[in-house]
Curated annotation (Swiss-Prot):
<dbReference type="GO" id="GO:0016020">
    <property type="term" value="C:membrane"/>
</dbReference>
<feature type="domain" description="Flavodoxin-like">
    <location>
        <begin position="3"/>
        <end position="162"/>
    </location>
</feature>
<protein>
    <recommendedName>
        <fullName>Uncharacterized protein YhcB</fullName>
    </recommendedName>
</protein>
<dbReference type="Pfam" id="PF03358">
    <property type="entry name" value="FMN_red"/>
</dbReference>
<dbReference type="InterPro" id="IPR029039">
    <property type="entry name" value="Flavoprotein-like_sf"/>
</dbReference>
<dbReference type="GO" id="GO:0010181">
    <property type="term" value="F:FMN binding"/>
</dbReference>
<dbReference type="GO" id="GO:0003955">
    <property type="term" value="F:NAD(P)H dehydrogenase (quinone) activity"/>
</dbReference>
<dbReference type="InterPro" id="IPR005025">
    <property type="entry name" value="FMN_Rdtase-like_dom"/>
</dbReference>
<dbReference type="InterPro" id="IPR008254">
    <property type="entry name" value="Flavodoxin/NO_synth"/>
</dbReference>
Length: 176
């Protein structure tokens, strides 16, 4: 199965989370995982993927302009139904606790529903998500005054999302 992680990152925080998600997905030996910054991401690759995970820093509860511009170029895939039944998931980082993580993830999920994708999040019984995460995807607060780019909890949450997407995608593609 092929999984594509696409991210926008301005201060490297979201890049670290994207890499953790890719690591988690790669724990499944059947997964071939690709990861690209949005500036290098090729929308033509999407129709060959089984799962697509995209994310960005949250900007006042909405998608970063770089990822939004990229998503807005997916209209022809929508018109041709190329992403229908592909697994989708999202992730986000913000600088503050109330920086709009969940609203940003809602905004990231919406285009996936328009494309007919099967969106997966992180259920509450996933240990990494129980006290730290969000049901909508991997959302991590990365305070600007911290010396570390990403907390260990954030990295574990990213890996958990990657594992979940890989597991669900494997289950859905096993019968094909």
């Amino acid at each position: 199965m092929k999984i594509y992680v696409v991210y926008d990152s301005e201060g490297e925080h979201t890049k670290v989370l994207a890499e953790a998600i890719a690591e988690g997905a790669r724990e499944n030996d059947a997964a071939e995982v690709f990861i690209d910054h949005v500036d290098q991401a090729d929308i033509r690759k999407l129709k060959d993927m089984d799962a697509i995970i995209w994310g960005c820093p949250g900007h006042f509860g909405t998608i970063s302009s770089g990822l939004k511009t990229w998503i807005d170029r997916l209209g022809y895939l929508w018109a041709e139904g190329e992403l229908i039944n592909k697994v989708g998931a999202v992730f986000c980082t913000t600088a503050t606790t109330h920086g709009g993580l969940e609203m940003t993830m809602h905004n990231l999920i919406t285009p996936m529903f328009h494309q007919g994708m099967i969106v997966v999040g992180l259920p509450g019984n996933v240990p990494e998500n129980a006290l730290y995460g969000s049901y909508y995807g991997a959302g991590v607060t990365c305070p600007v005054d911290s010396d570390e780019l990403m907390s260990e909890e954030g990295i574990q949450l990213g890996r958990a999302l990657g594992r979940r997407v890989s597991q669900v995608t494997g289950n859905l593609t096993a019968g094909q």
